[in-house]
Amino acid sequence: PMKSKGIYELSHILLDQYAGEVPQSFEALEALPAVGHKTASVVMSQGFGVPAFPVDTHIHRLLYRWCLTNGKSVKQTELDAKRLFPKAKWNKLHLQIIFYGREYSPARGWDLKRDFISARIGRRALLKKTFGPNYHELFARA
C-alpha cells in the first residue's frame, strides 16, 4: 500500500538527509513523501510548538456547523480559523475542538441535547435538514 511505502521512503530520507531528525519547517516537511499540509501542521504545532491550525475533516465539519466557515474547502476553513482566533491560541484550540467533536458533536449519532454549541450557534439550515423544522424543541429548556 502507498501509506507503508511512503513511511518507508520517509524514514530513509530522514536518516539520510536529516541525520534522523524531523525537519522544523513547513516547506521541508511538506516536501517529504506521505506528508501533506495537515500532517506538517500537526508536527509543527504539537511537535515543535509553532503556531498552526491543522484542519482535518472533523475540524472542518465542526467549524461549518458553527457557522465559522462557509464549508467550501479544508483550505478555506483553515484560513477562516486563523483569521477568527488569536495565533497564540491555535495549537490548544485545535485540540479542544477535536476533543469537543469526539465527545459532543460526532459525525454520526449527532445529538443536539449534548452538542450545546451547535444547538446555540449552529447553522440553522443544517440543523433543519438534519433534525427537522422543529429542531429547536430538541434542546428547549423545561
Annotate each predicted stretch with a short phrase.
Residues 1-141:
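Catalytic cores of DNA base-excision repair glycosylases
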